[in-house]
């Protein structure tokens, strides 16, 4: 029997990125448990409607998921205090940044951070690349992570 991994998807604002990620991950990796965490109830609700296995809202769920998830996926801002127009608290950013979980961060430009050398990709292209990274993670033996 295949090991079930927990993927925490963290998003804020209206949750459109998180919604797209949940849909894509559940379609490609149905065996994966997806925990969707919204920094607000609107984002959490959008991710629930897209098929997440569970949802939560706010700072403490981010902190708990950072301790327990195998993978964390979301916009780059989730490791930057005050990003997403102030929705990412310093506690959230530190919890995600220090988490032992493998992190797949999409360089969405809403956090006053520029990534030099970053390509201008569409959201769909970034999600496709994120899915490839998730596949690589799932295929790698635990000791190689």
Language-model region placement:
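Short, glycine-/small-residue-rich phosphate/pyrophosphate-handling segment
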Residues: 105-142
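Glycine-rich phosphate-binding loop
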Residues: 54-92
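N-terminal beta-loop-helix "entrance" segment that forms/cooperates
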Residues: 33-57, 113-118
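A short helix->loop->beta-strand "cap" motif at the edges of active sites that frequently abuts
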Residues: 31-32, 98-103
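A charged, well-structured terminal subsegment
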Residues: 67-74, 79, 128-145
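Short, ordered loop/turn segments at secondary-structure junctions
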Residues: 12, 39-42, 60-61, 78, ...
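Short glycine-rich or small-residue beta-strand-to-loop segments that form or flank ligand, phosphate
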Residues: 6-11, 72-79, 104
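Glycine-rich phosphate/diphosphate-binding loop of Rossmann-like nucleotide-binding domains
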Residues: 5-41
């Amino acid at each position: 029997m295949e090991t079930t991994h927990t993927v925490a998807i963290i998003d804020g604002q209206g949750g459109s990125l998180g919604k797209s990620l949940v849909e894509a991950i559940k379609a490609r990796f149905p065996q994966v448990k997806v925990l969707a965490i919204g920094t607000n109830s609107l984002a959490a609700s959008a991710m629930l409607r897209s098929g997440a296995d569970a949802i939560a809202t706010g700072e403490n769920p981010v902190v708990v998921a950072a301790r327990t998830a195998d993978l964390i996926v979301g916009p780059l801002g989730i490791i930057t205090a005050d990003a997403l127009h102030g929705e990412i608290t310093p506690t959230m950013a530190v919890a995600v940044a220090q988490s032992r979980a493998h992190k797949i961060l999409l360089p969405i430009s809403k956090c006053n951070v520029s990534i030099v050398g970053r390509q201008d990709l569409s959201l769909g292209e970034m999600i496709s690349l994120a899915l490839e990274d998730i596949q690589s993670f799932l295929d790698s033996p635990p000791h190689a992570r």
